[in-house]
Design a protein with these regions (language model features):
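Conserved S-adenosyl-L-methionine
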Residues: 112-114
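Conserved GNAT-fold acetyl-CoA-binding loop/helix
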Residues: 1-13
Length: 140
C-alpha cells in the first residue's frame, strides 16, 4: 500500500513529540512507524484504558519478508509493558483483510470496526473510510 501524503507539519510534529521511530539495518532506514498513547479520533467509543497505539507502519520496498513487522511488534510490546499500558492497539482499513489476518496471527483480536466522519484531527483521506480496530496484550 502506498500512503497518501502527510503534511510536513504533521511529520515534524511527530518527530518533535518523539513519537516517530525508524528501523535501521546496515545504516539504511528500512522502516518507520509512529506511536501514540491515545487515539480518540479513530477509536472513538472504543477508547478506554491506557494502550500503546502503533500507526503508519511502513517499510522499504526492498526489504520484504525479513521479519521487520515482527521486530516492530516485539519492540512495541516491550514498550507497552515497560510503560505499564493495558495493551497494544493497531488499526487499518477495514477492507485490508490480508493485514487484519496478519495481525490476528500475531495475537491481535478484532475489537470492532468504525467508519470515520470528517474530523479536523485526521488527514482528509481518513474521512468516510471504515477502519478495523485490533488489540492484544503487551506480551502476546
Amino acid at each position: 500500500m502506498v500512503w497518501p501524503e502527510f503534511t510536513d507539519a504533521a511529520i515534524l510534529g511527530e518527530i518533535d513529540a518523539r513519537h516517530l521511530f525508524r528501523v535501521v539495518v546496515d545504516d539504511a532506514i528500512v522502516g518507520v512507524f509512529s506511536v501514540a498513547y491515545e487515539d480518540p479520533a479513530i477509536w472513538g467509543p472504543y477508547e478506554r484504558g491506557a494502550h500503546l497505539y502503533l500507526h503508519r507502519i511502513a517499510r522499504a520496498a526492498q526489504y520484504p519478508g525479513r521479519g521487520l513487522m515482527d521486530a516492530i511488534l516485539a519492540w512495541a510490546g516491550h514498550q507497552c509493558t515497560v510503560l505499564g499500558r493495558d495493551g497494544l492497539r493497531v488499526d487499518t482499513w477495514a477492507s485490508n483483510t490480508t493485514l487484519i489476518a496478519f495481525y490476528q496471527r500475531r495475537g491481535f483480536r478484532l475489537v470492532g470496526e468504525r467508519r470515520l466522519g470528517a474530523d479536523p484531527r485526521l488527514p482528509p483521506h481518513y474521512h468516510g473510510n471504515a477502519f478495523a480496530l485490533l488489540e492484544r496484550s503487551c506480551d502476546a
